[in-house]
Each structure stands twice: as structure tokens, then as C-alpha cells.
Amino acid sequence: MVGTIHALPDFVRWRSPAIESAASAADLLVVEIAALDDDAALARTFTGLSRSPGLPPLAERLPRDLRPALAALMDRGGIAPAQFAETETWAAALTLARIDASGDPANGVDRALIAEFKDRRVRELEGGAAQLAIFDRLPEAQQRAMLAAVVKDSVAAAKDPERLQRAWLA
């Protein structure tokens, strides 16, 4: 079993002997989402699930003490508060989580392994639509907890965007 990371910078050397051995010996690859090359379908699903009219402003969906960090995060991402006017809380959290992330999803280990397994079986745990539907069905309180966690983590991520990559590569 190999846990993957979804985005890495160009030219990162992640193929250790252990990963090479596991990948060559495996006849099955299990990933979260197998159709990672279909960005348009994932975007359509995200848009369809993530929009609802009549939502409170995003800042009001957080405790007061996190609102300055939310404002700073949105500023770093070039996002105006009005852009989230009809965005469900879970979708805002996923969008905001990408702001300080480093690396390129095109360099994700999951994508590389899926391409390598083109003649072997690839199975997905959820798939893109099902994974987004899980977030969409979360009660609002859990969505707000997710948003709060993203905002709290953004302070550390802004200071050290590569920390998750270093941890995975270690």
C-alpha cells in the first residue's frame, strides 16, 4: 500500500525503490478518483453541487476569531467575498484549501500511477462525483468545522507551503 499526494512541483523525485517495487508487482491500483484526466466533468459536478441561493456571507459561517484569517486567506487568493455568495460551505473550504497549496496536480503521484497502470486494473474508492457528494451531504455544522479547519491551517500553510510535500517525501 502506498499513500499518494495529489500535487507536487515539477521534477520532484518521488519514485523510491519501495514504490517502484510495489508498483511493478501490483496487478491492481486503488485510488480515490480514477478519472483524474476529466477535469471538465469534475468541474461540472463541483459547480452543480456547490451552489445554493440565500446563504449567509462566508465570514458569518465562521467564529468571529477566525474571520481575520479568512480575510487574509481570501486576499492571498485574490477572492472577493461576493464570489462565495452562493457557494456552499464545503465547496468554499475546498477552494480555499488550494490557495496556499504548492505543487501542480498534473504532477500528482496518483496521476502518474494511473498512467503507469494503463494495462492493469485501476479501481476507484469513490470517484469524483461521489466524493463531492459526500461533502455536499455533510450537515452544515460539519461543513463549518471543515471551513474553520482550513482557515486555521492556512496560517501554517502560508508560512510553509511545502510542509505536506516534505512530510510525504520523507
Where are these regions (language model features)?
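Structured, acidic catalytic/metal-binding patches in enzyme active sites
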Residues: 1-170
